[in-house]
Amino acid sequence: VKETIYSVMFDRIEAGTYLVAAAVTEGNLKIKNIIPKIIQTEINTLKKIGAKIKATKDEVHIIGNKKIKNMNIKTAPYPGFPTDLQAQMMVLLCKANKQSIIKEDIFENRFMHVAELNRMGAKISTNGNKAKVSGNIRFEAAELMATDLRASVSLILAALTTKGKSVINRIYHLDRGY
């Protein structure tokens, strides 16, 4: 056995979540030590929605835009749009100029976050594997219940955009992935 050095690659869902967080809060964020081509689908999606993104060999810089464009998204295996980023993107699409549709083609029952987002003022309806996301939403602070990892992070992202205090119960789900 010989000594070796190995570096673990970044988590593309975490990176995508941070990019969505910057977009939804109209923030300015630079992520270093990343390989942008691994998350090219996520970068392209955020650009189409209106975020300003510059990628170099090992970093991504995003500036969120107040004006978010609507978009229809379909989850798919890599390199398609990741199912594990669908809830976060739904929060961003609530701020879009028009209705968007998210089609979940990977797993069943992946809209657990919708009821709590609607309690915050979102207007999202689901039918099977499709969610219709109304745009021009301003989230309101609320006491909420996280049901899983994706719901946890989506509620945090929505709460970041509110005035007032939101309380997210059962946030321990977040520990599984972030």
Model-found features: residue ranges?
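Short, structured segments at the rim of ligand-binding sites
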Residues: 1-178
